[in-house]
A protein has these predicted regions:
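SAM/dcSAM-binding transferase cores
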Residues: 16-24, 31-32, 169, 187, ...
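Conserved alpha-helix/loop element of class I SAM-dependent methyltransferases that forms part
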Residues: 34-38, 42, 74, 85-104
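Active-site/binding-pocket entry motifs
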Residues: 60, 69, 78, 216, ...
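Short, surface-exposed glycine/acidic/tryptophan-bearing loops
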Residues: 62-80, 84-85
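N-terminal auxiliary segments of SAM/dcSAM-dependent transferases
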Residues: 15-66
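Bacterial N-terminal signal peptides
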Residues: 1-13
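Conserved nucleotide-cofactor-binding alpha/beta core module
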Residues: 99-217
Length: 239
């Protein structure tokens, strides 16, 4: 019940209506993509700009070739390096919770296959995406460029430290779970900015949104989730 209440609270009422007709005409993937978007709408994804982005991004290009027939099932799928591409509903939900309007600069931690970056690319001015696995980062950068997402920059590195030379950011999205929000990411978030990420506790993971205010962070829980753990410096205990 909490998830639906919070989704309603954080839905983007200010977003303008746009078409959700997917690119690609009548091919089978376009039909499946449109059906997926209808399902997302039924699950509480109400921001028309997010629905439009989900309708435009070809998820089949971001999964393994053997998984292309399952590309538009609402489920996570494996990718290289023991990682996963997130469930479409979670991609849409995290994007909606950020309340993006179009002129933002967004930092993504955990590029993976590049799907979330592609969705953000449709919605914002600039996307900076960091991936700790160099092979995944290189593959995602090549894939995004080949598909025409020109406002996305990808680099290999430890997302714990963010991308300081490109900061500050209007929004930060973290696609791996950690016990607490990395301090460098908070520092690189603009005042009034939003961060969304899964936080891990002993009893499971909770997707949260953190708003950076003058007196600190306002954290709102969204829903229970299951993400791969964040790796790198975040694993080192703080003295």
């Amino acid at each position: 019940m909490l998830a639906w209440q919070v989704i309603g609270l954080l839905s983007c009422a200010a977003c303008s209506s746009t078409s959700t007709e997917p690119a690609g005409g009548g091919d089978e993937f376009a039909v499946a993509r449109a059906r997926l978007v209808d399902g997302l709408r039924a699950q509480g994804i109400t921001d028309p700009r997010v629905l439009n982005a989900m309708a435009l991004v070809p998820r089949e290009e971001f999964v393994r070739s053997e998984d292309r027939p399952q590309a538009y099932r609402d489920q996570a799928l494996p990718i290289a390096g023991g990682q996963t591409i997130s469930q479409p509903y979670i991609v849409a939900l995290m994007t909606q919770v950020l309340e993006l309007h179009g002129n933002e600069r967004v930092l993504e931690v955990g590029t993976g296959s590049g799907l979330q970056a592609a969705v953000l690319s449709v919605l914002v001015r600039e996307v900076y995406s960091i991936e700790i696995d160099p092979q995944l980062a290189a593959a995602a950068e090549h894939r995004l460029r080949a598909l025409g997402y020109r406002n996305v920059r990808v680099r290999a590195g430890d997302g714990y430290y963010g991308w300081p030379e490109a900061a500050p950011f209007d929004a930060v999205i973290v696609t791996a779970a950690a016990a607490k929000i990395p301090q460098p990411l908070i520092a690189q978030l603009k005042p009034g900015g939003r961060l969304v990420m899964p936080l891990a506790k002993d009893d499971g993971q909770t997707l949260i949104r953190a708003d950076k205010q003058e007196d600190g962070l306002r954290i709102v829980p969204v829903t229970a989730v299951a993400f791969v753990p964040m790796t790198g410096a975040v694993e080192t205990p703080t003295p």
